[in-house]
Design a protein with these regions (language model features):
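Domain-core and long-helix interface of multi-subunit machines
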Residues: 107, 114-208
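Generic structural signal for well-ordered alpha-helices
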Residues: 23-28, 67-75, 144-147, 202, ...
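A cross-domain feature marking catalytic cores of carbohydrate-active enzymes
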Residues: 7-9, 42, 86-92, 115-116, ...
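Charged catalytic cores and adjacent phosphate/nucleic-acid-binding surfaces used
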Residues: 1-12, 171-257
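Acidic (Asp/Glu)-rich catalytic clusters
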Residues: 2, 31-32, 72-81, 101-110, ...
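Short, acidic/polar
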Residues: 18-29, 95-103, 141-150
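An N-terminally biased module of ancient metal coordination in phosphate/nucleic-acid-related enzymes
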Residues: 1-94, 167-177, 219-223, 237
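Structural preference for beta-strand elements that scaffold enzyme active sites
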Residues: 1-4, 37-39, 83-87, 110-113, ...
Length: 257
């Protein structure tokens, strides 16, 4: 089975649009690329219901969409038999993580992605961001500390782009990858389209054998399932024969491929 569990509903011009027509475009693209099931995982800070947990202008400027409408669109697609799952990409927000989890708890998610883009209000995947305030070693240390905190919170099911800190090809001389229990890791092809030019995560993060999903981080239908041949090779090289399939925040294992 091939799943793509990380994508964002957009129109052909990459504008946010939470509509059944947009869902259908992504579903058609998935079928054309041999992807059996897709999951929509919009950024949590796009929804006004979560407004009170955000502090950065980047987040609050985008916090204008209706979470209930987004959920209903994906649920309607499911009712119509489309092979889609309902999810969100849940950002690390430190002390506000419990509050954010409580806001999201009433909704019927199939899974929740966890990601770390900001630490103490400074971006990891944008420059200058945290890179202007801390050494490379310190950025990585703080990044993985946040990843571990998010993974151990019980609030997310899958970690998105788990070693995002490598995005600009700046790495410590020695990287200590943390033990991450209780969550799956996505093998993401998005890194191939970033300055690092690599899949997320590094093979070393898969050595302990955590459950995996596959992800494109598509913002347009053309990127659904993109470079998944390389993602599958990466997974098999690490010893994987199955992929996690989620429903109602419960995972089962299905044969990979």
């Amino acid at each position: 089975m091939i799943v793509d569990y990380h994508m964002h509903l957009r129109d052909p011009d990459e504008r946010v649009v939470h509509s059944l027509e947009a869902v259908e475009r992504f579903v058609v693209a998935a079928a054309e690329r041999g992807v059996d099931e897709i999951g929509f995982s919009e950024h949590v800070y796009y929804f006004r219901q979560t407004r009170r947990v955000w502090a950065l202008d980047y987040q609050t400027e985008r916090c204008v969409y209706d979470l209930d409408a987004y959920v209903e669109v994906v649920l309607e697609a499911k009712r119509q038999g489309m092979p889609v799952k309902l999810a969100l990409e849940v950002d690390y927000v430190g002390e506000q993580q419990d509050e954010l989890a409580a806001l999201l708890a009433p909704y019927p998610w199939d899974y929740l992605l966890g990601s770390v883009h900001w630490i103490d209000g400074l971006a990891v995947d944008q420059q200058p961001g945290l890179w202007a305030r801390a050494s490379v070693d310190e950025v990585w240390r703080r990044y993985f500390a946040a990843v571990v905190e998010l993974a151990s919170s019980g609030h997310v099911d899958v970690l998105a782009h788990p070693d995002l800190a490598k995005i600009f090809r700046m790495r410590p001389d020695h990287i200590e990858y943390p033990a991450l229990d209780g969550v799956a890791l996505e093998i993401s092809t998005a890194g191939l389209r970033k300055p690092v030019g690599e899949l997320y995560p590094a093979a070393a993060m898969l050595e302990a054998g955590p459950p995996i999903t596959l992800a494109s981080d598509a913002h347009v239908p053309a990127d659904v399932g993109r470079d998944f041949d390389r993602a599958v090779v990466h997974a098999r090289a690490a010893g994987y024969e199955t992929v996690s399939v989620f429903e109602g925040r419960k995972a089962r294992q299905e044969p990979l491929g």
